[in-house]
Structures are given as structure tokens and as C-alpha cells.
Amino acid sequence: MYADSGPDPLPDDQVCLVVEVFRMLADATRVQVLWSLADREMSVNELAEQVGKPAPSVSQHLAKLRMARLVRTRRDGTTIFYRLENEHVRQLVIDAVFNAEHAGPGIPRHHRAAGGLQSVAKASATKDVG
């Protein structure tokens, strides 16, 4: 009936993995941890200070994120450093935060960042000209 009916359905096992990723994102502390790791690796103590939670609590969240393959570790002596698993996780976190900013009032913060409004204005001007 339709030439292009959209993407094929996802296999059940892949859907389960996607659901697990979203389940991990459904916790405010884990979102703060992932956001903190978007641009650099950090130790548990650094993350605990950054998100304002006790280190044992952050450590438990990190264990869940690691099991879900959203973060990975690197040991340096007795210190374990955490970072996002890959660029896809980083992009997922950034996109989720930016999408949430669009739900609020006014201009989203990421559009106000250095060059943000200018970039939006240039894109708009290009559309008007073209």
C-alpha cells in the first residue's frame, strides 16, 4: 500500500536494551552524573562533590550505569576514573538535556551559549535568503 512505511520494527532484544538505557536516565542523580561526564572523566569523589551526593550513593549509581554500558572505568593506582562509554552515550545525554531546555520558557540555555544565538540567527537568515 505504501512505498515507504518507515523503519523496520526493532528486534525484541534490542528494544529491551533501549528500555534499559531509558530506565537508567530516569533518575535525577544518574542524569547529573552522566552530564558531569559529558566532557571529561572523573573519580567517584569528584562526581560526588559535583552532584552534591555522598560518594557511596554515587558509587552505587555508577555501578548501575556501568552494568548498562553507559560508563566505563580506568584505574590509576588506587583511584578509579569514570567516563562515558562512547560518543553515542555523550550525544544521547546532550540531546536529552537540550530537548528538556526547549520544554521550558524562553530561549534554551544552549542557544544562549557563546555563538548560540548568532548561530541560530545565521541559520534563520540563510533560510530567508535561500
From Swiss-Prot:
Pfam families given in the database record: HTH_5 (PF01022)
DNA-binding region boundaries: 44-67
Induction text: Negatively autoregulated.
Organism placement in taxonomy: Bacteria, Bacillati, Actinomycetota, Actinomycetes, Mycobacteriales
InterPro entries referenced in this protein's UniProt entry, alphabetically: ArsR-like_HTH, HTH_ArsR_DNA-bd_dom, Metal_resp_trans_reg, WH-like_DNA-bd_sf, WH_DNA-bd_sf
Note: KmtR has tighter affinities for nickel and cobalt than NmtR.
Family matches, as CDD domains: HTH_ARSR
Name this protein carries in UniProt: HTH-type transcriptional regulator KmtR
Activity regulation, short description: Binding to DNA is inhibited by nickel and cobalt ions.
GO MF term list: DNA binding; DNA-binding transcription factor activity
Membrane-traversing stretches: none
GO terms for biological process, alphabetical: response to cobalt ion; response to nickel cation
